[in-house]
Regions:
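Helix-to-loop junction immediately C-terminal to a conserved catalytic motif
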Residues: 54
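Conserved ABC ATPase "signature" region
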Residues: 102, 106-129
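Catalytic Walker B motif of ABC-type/P-loop ATPase nucleotide-binding domains
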Residues: 158-161
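Conserved ABC transporter NBD signature motif
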Residues: 62-70, 78, 215-217
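The feature captures the beta-strand-to-loop junction immediately N-terminal to the Walker
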Residues: 39-41
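A short, surface-exposed alpha-helical micro-motif characterized by mixed small hydrophobic
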Residues: 198-200
């Protein structure tokens, strides 16, 4: 990805399940280094759009590029530049935090896995628990390991799928601090039902309803009160 290129380009992206279009003709460009929050009611297509952009699903139509790579033509190369943090743990519960991270580091071909894993465990504040099985961790601690796992191969774009689900307020604060600490020049894309939190975190906001983009704009161009009303209006639209 050349300097100044957008981190994500979606062009007429569509995903159908039978006769229903979960994502319907979605187009937008997101500058590199941005934090995009995607909002919308249940069934709006938020998670489906995220899955398309992080190569977990194939589009029915249209194209998308992430980190300068066409997802349709070079999906494996794109995955090497993408990280994912989900509300569903992608960790092996009986393995230690260190073992989980080493597994993913080797999977991605990280040059010095042990050093990289040690660095990330220090970043997320879990060096002292590195040898403990993940199943002994709290929900908040598990999410901290998930942050480290998503960053183990130093991705350019990180996707977050409802990352606050099940976290208590203290764990949410720690999660936010860690994300701020690793933002650097990375691009983040988050799906969230928490309007206030998502708006606070983002540089850009995208609202969906019935699979379509209702609004996409930099946060600086949005008034929170008007934006909250727009969100409430989309909730009233329901699903297709």
């Amino acid at each position: 990805m050349a300097s100044g290129d957008p981190a994500i380009v979606a062009s007429h992206l569509t995903k159908s399940f039978g006769t229903r279009r979960a994502v319907d003709d979605v187009s937008f460009q997101l500058p590199a280094g941005s934090f995009l929050s995607i909002f919308g009611p249940n069934g709006a297509g938020k998670t489906t759009l995220l899955r398309l952009l992080c190569t977990l699903a194939r589009p029915s139509g249209g194209r998308a590029c992430v980190a300068g790579i066409d997802l349709k033509e070079r999906p494996d190369e794109a995955r090497a530049r993408i990280g994912l943090i989900s509300h569903q743990s992608m960790l092996y519960p009986d393995l230690s935090a260190e073992e989980n991270l080493l597994l993913y580091a080797r999977l991605y071909g990280v040059a010095d896995p042990q050093a990289r894993v040690g660095e990330l465990l220090q970043v997320v504040g879990l060096s002292h628990r590195r040898l403990d099985p993940v199943r002994t961790f709290s929900r908040g601690m598990t999410q901290r390991v998930s942050i480290a796992r998503a960053l183990v191969h130093d991705p350019q774009v990180v996707f977050l799928d409802e990352p606050y689900s099940g976290l208590d307020p203290h764990a949410v604060d720690i999660f936010d601090e860690l994300i701020d600490a690793v933002r650097d020049e990375r691009t983040f894309v988050m799906v969230s039902h928490d309007l206030a939190k998502g708006f606070q975190m983002c540089t850009h906001a995208l609202v969906m309803a019935r699979g379509r983009v209702v609004r996409f704009a930099p946060r600086d161009h949005l008034d929170y009160g008007d934006f909250a009303q727009l969100y409430r209006d989309t909730v009233g639209m329901g699903v297709a």
